[in-house]
């Protein structure tokens, strides 16, 4: 398994023959890639946590170019259908639900404490034979993260630390305590001035309360499991 960060909350999780593109705002100011480069990478599925512009991103254009199905909440799938995505190319689900993508890859939709234009914001747990990744989406800290950690043996947690619109470093470090992942990658920070944070501060906070290993990635970096 490998996880590539495109900046902000955009990631590509590759495992076996699956390439799961999550929250593809590829034109974000930190991204080293263009939408065409991501299209050329041929994602097999596109996962969207909610419909704010910085998460919906270029998902519709990428889906149209590649034929990759879009996974997200029922209401969000109605929204992308209005933008020209055929119903057959959508995979609607809801919080607490599970879908199987084949080759042993399963996607669980988790709660997130945030807002959305349509539908409920969410996170995703991607469970594969090579490891399990939790993408928290945009969220505040919430106690049921402990339950997510109990239900899923998380190898990598992708957590927002930018504050203002999500939890900040202090709260995200507590989230690590609740989730108990083996590895943590901070995300959703330094994309614009309002969410400027020092990821090393987050790393120090986590190391003070947890044995999880923090990987401070640069946009374009790849984490291999």
UniProtKB/Swiss-Prot annotation:
Q: Where is the signal peptide?
A: none
Which Pfam family, giving just one, matches this sequence?
A: Lactamase_B_2
Keywords associated with the record: Hydrolase
Q: Which GO terms describe its molecular function?
A: hydrolase activity
Q: Which domain of life is it from?
A: Archaea
Q: InterPro entries given for it? A: Metallo-B-lactamas, RibonucZ/Hydroxyglut_hydro, UPF0173, UPF0173_UPF0282_UlaG_hydrolase
Q: Per its UniProt record, what PANTHER family does this chain match?
A: UPF0173 METAL-DEPENDENT HYDROLASE MJ1163 (PTHR43546:SF3), UPF0173 METAL-DEPENDENT HYDROLASE MJ1163-RELATED (PTHR43546)
HAMAP family on file = UPF0173
UniProt family annotation: Belongs to the UPF0173 family.
Q: What is this protein called?
A: UPF0173 metal-dependent hydrolase Pars_0810
Q: Which organism is it from?
A: Pyrobaculum arsenaticum (strain DSM 13514 / JCM 11321 / PZ6)
């Amino acid at each position: 398994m490998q996880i590539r960060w495109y900046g902000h909350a955009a990631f590509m999780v590759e495992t076996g023959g699956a390439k799961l593109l999550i929250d593809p705002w590829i034109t974000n100011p930190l991204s080293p890639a263009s939408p065409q480069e991501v299209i050329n990478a041929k994602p097999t599925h596109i996962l969207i946590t909610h419909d704010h512009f910085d998460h919906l991103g270029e998902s519709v254009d990428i889906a149209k170019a590649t034929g990759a199905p879009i996974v997200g909440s029922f209401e969000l799938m109605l929204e992308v259908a209005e933008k020209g995505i055929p119903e057959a190319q959508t995979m609607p689900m809801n919080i607490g639900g599970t879908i199987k993508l084949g080759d042993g890859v399963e996607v669980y939709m988790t709660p997130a404490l945030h807002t959305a234009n349509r539908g409920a914001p969410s996170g995703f747990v991607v469970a594969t034979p090579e490891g399990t990744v939790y993408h928290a989406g945009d969220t505040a800290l919430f106690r049921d993260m402990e339950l997510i950690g109990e239900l899923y043996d998380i190898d990598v947690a992708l957590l927002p630390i930018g504050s203002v619109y999500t939890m900040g470093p202090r709260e995200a470090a507590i989230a690590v305590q609740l989730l108990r992942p083996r590895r943590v990658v901070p995300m959703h920070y330094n994309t614009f001035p309002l969410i400027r944070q020092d990821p090393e501060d987050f790393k120090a906070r986590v190391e003070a309360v947890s044995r999880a290993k923090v990987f401070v990635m640069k946009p374009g970096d790849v984490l291999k499991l």
